Regions:
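H-loop/switch region of ABC-family ATPase nucleotide-binding domains
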Residues: 172-174
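Catalytic Walker B motif of ABC-type/P-loop ATPase nucleotide-binding domains
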Residues: 137-141
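ABC ATPase NBD coupling module
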Residues: 60-74
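Q-loop/switch helix immediately C-terminal to the Walker
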Residues: 72, 79-98
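Hydrophobic anchor residue at the start of the ABC signature
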Residues: 126
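Helix-to-loop junction immediately C-terminal to a conserved catalytic motif
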Residues: 45
């Protein structure tokens, strides 16, 4: 699998962002509300106009059609859109093991999305994205609506999968404890720059 490289990314207040994420590495991002964390992920996934570029392996973002890039570098936003009624219709392929690991029952695939809680939708959004087999993953606080037990359950399922698929991951993390559990490296947004912080103290 290929690594993800950010070259001179500029979006919103952020300027000249350079970052390399190795295959299988989780790089956590943090910073105050409005600092640009989500906008940076949207720029990398080609969902928002920006300066600079991103690369996945040797392929530059602007060298392929936007929809093809977004199929490889996939973002799970804090709030996802749902186009179909049933859970199963949102999955590119059946993922019963993933649904079970995240606390869903055998009948979940036939459920209407409208009956799911915000936390269940957040978990389902992650399963939906992984069912499309992306080559890089951008996660915008994917556990923000989950309690501690469910958060740990999601992490225990997701981390081995990231290592197995060797996915480079940018993860906007929810709190310092989570960063210490997950991050290979941690960058805090300060002003217009990324400042590397120690992961474990």
């Amino acid at each position: 699998m290929a690594g993800l490289t950010l070259e001179r990314i500029a979006v919103g207040a952020l300027k000249d962002i350079h970052l390399d994420v190795a295959p299988g590495e989780i790089v956590c991002l943090s910073g105050p509300s409005g600092s640009g964390k989500s906008r940076l992920l949207r720029a990398v996934s080609d969902l928002e106009p920006h300066g600079g570029t991103a690369r996945l392996g040797g392929v530059e973002q602007g060298a392929v059609a936007g929809h093809r890039w977004r199929r490889s570098v996939m973002m799970v936003p804090a709030e996802s859109a749902w186009w179909f009624d049933s859970v199963g219709e949102h999955l590119h392929k059946p993922m019963p093991e993933a649904l079970e690991a995240l606390g869903f029952s055998d009948e979940t695939a036939s459920w209407s999305v409208s009956r799911l809680s915000s936390g269940e939708k957040q978990r389902l959004a992650l399963v939906r994205t992984l069912s499309r087999e992306p080559r890089a993953l951008l996660l915008d606080e994917p556990t923000a609506n989950l309690d501690e037990t469910t958060t740990r359950r999601l992490e225990d399922w997701l981390l081995p999968l990231i290592r197995k698929r060797r996915l480079p991951v940018l993860w906007v993390a929810h709190g310092g404890e989570q960063i210490r559990r997950l991050a290979g490296r941690h960058f805090r947004i300060e002003g217009a720059r990324l400042v590397e912080e120690p992961v474990r103290t």
